[in-house]
Amino acid sequence: MEVGIDFGTTFSTICFSPSGVSGCTPVAGSVYVETQIFIPEGSSTYLIGKAAGKAYRDGVEGRLYVNPKRWAGVTRDNVERYVEKLKPTYTVKIDSGGALLIGGLGSGPDTLLRVVDVICLFLRALILECERYTSTTVTAAVVTVPADYNSFKRSFVVEALKGLGIPVRGVVNEPTAAALYSLAKSRVEDLLLAVFDFGGGTFDVSFVKKKGNILCVIFSVGDNFLGGRDIDRAIVEVIKQKIKGKASDAKLGIFVSSMKEDLSNNNAITQHLIPVEGGVEVVDLTSDELDAIVAPFSARAVEVFKTGLDNFYPDPVIAVMTGGSSALVKVRSDVANLPQISKVVFDSTDFRCSVACGAKVYCDTLAGNSGLRLVDTLTNTLTDEVVGLQPVVIFPKGSPIPCSYTHRYTVGGGDVVYGIFEGENNRAFLNEPTFRGVSKRRGDPVETDVAQFNLSTDGTVSVIVNGEEVKNEYLVPGTTNVLDSLVYKSGREDLEAKAIPEYLTTLNILHDKAFTRRNLGNKDKGFSDLRIEENFLKSAVDTDTILNG
């Protein structure tokens, strides 16, 4: 079985069938799994998602590792800039080998882990949950990344998946995946769509067109430092002014995310319970106050969006909203008010899983199991600096993926350094470096190099000079043996140990029975006659509310 994975900043989703929520794997009752892991002190196991967050909130000794995706692409050269922008409440450092390490939130010794290890541990658990749910082995995956990720950032995810031993069929941009899913289930023809993907940590827009069974990405734009987490931090600052007790920013950040969702779904809600030291406080926060907090972030997203819209003026554009922050009323309203937008499409049922479902559609396409074809394109220009800091274009922005380019260079007798930069600046050193490698010289003092530049379906770059591949010195340091020392624990065992006896007690009292664990199954006539699951579904209980306490 091959899967699509939406590896998100705040939530992640794994899809085994592109049929919406029903084709995604639930973990702790939800297909939207918090992108975090918790390692209890002195334990050889770890938790993910809701179970990880609950262990941290309950004060279990150990460390909660959060936001690994936001650190993709960080090196010794730019770590200070990222720390300044992201303002982490945990330790961040670069080790002697150039690998990025992050610490965790919580108590006990703060063990620093490589970001690729955190990503790998999380994805490994997500895949295990999918295999348990479907009783099928995962053999390959397509993973999504923000549209504005360069080749180096994409390699973080690729390296993490290498640690799993699972081949990556491709790495696709998040808004492209959402568009692929949206168009796969619609009959839209020859219209210009803009997929507005406002996620937890990044904001991206891809402009796409569909003709027959062919979907073509024609332009992408984004901001890697804008997302729902930024809005959460702003809400935290407001809440801190309203409460009298003490509460850590990290714990408040977990609770304000649900407050944001509650207000988006029901503007009549005005009061919220906030945990503080020694108890809880009731805090007033209205939908109007939320709109005021969201406004500057929505304005930033709209400004980025408009830079893309300008390329297609005056053509009308349909905006397809995806990503968790697209659920915010203020964001959707600001997009709808743009003159060039003819329609806003927002599916409240599938919008949060559309990226994972689109990744699965793309996986099926690459495997030859779908009639759809995607022409994906390069988000930024790739250049090679030859002389005088002048960039020579290797792959222009908008080049199809995958693609290849061959160039001949007259070189001297010494080693030759090949460097590739990504970006639109007319000075190479002002763009993001994505490749650096040395081609060793042999033979005559002056010769011709035949260099082949390759851009693969996973978005990474390779260079072959005179038939020999040049090693990229910017390669992300890979995963470590920490993967062998930790075993995923779903938390299901502890939950069942506590919940099943309570469930049996309640069941036997309500129905005057004497059921034991052996009776809990549809094969037992006495139990199946109660039609418990059928009646539960008829009651229309909000399961997320129950699971979130």
Swiss-Prot record:
SUPFAM superfamilies listed in its UniProt record: Actin-like ATPase domain, Heat shock protein 70kD (HSP70), peptide-binding domain
Highest rank taxon of the organism: Viruses
Compartment(s): Virion
Database matches in Pfam families: HSP70 (PF00012)
GO molecular function, one term: ATP-dependent protein folding chaperone
Signal peptide, first to last residue: none
One GO term describing the cellular component: virion component
Keyword Transport applies: no
InterPro entries linked: ATPase_NBD, HSP70_peptide-bd_sf, Hsp_70_fam
Keywords: ATP-binding, Chaperone, Nucleotide-binding, Virion
UniProt-listed Gene3D superfamilies: 3.30.420.40, Actin, Chain A, domain 4 (3.90.640.10)
Family: Belongs to the heat shock protein 70 family.
Function: Transports viral genome to neighboring plant cells directly through plasmosdesmata, without any budding. The movement protein allows efficient cell to cell propagation, by bypassing the host cell wall barrier. Two movement proteins, p6, Hsp70h and three structural proteins, CP, CPm, and P64 are essential for cell-cell movement. Also plays a role in virion formation. Together with CPm and p64, encapsidates the 5'-terminal portion of the viral genome.
Name this protein carries in UniProt: Movement protein Hsp70h
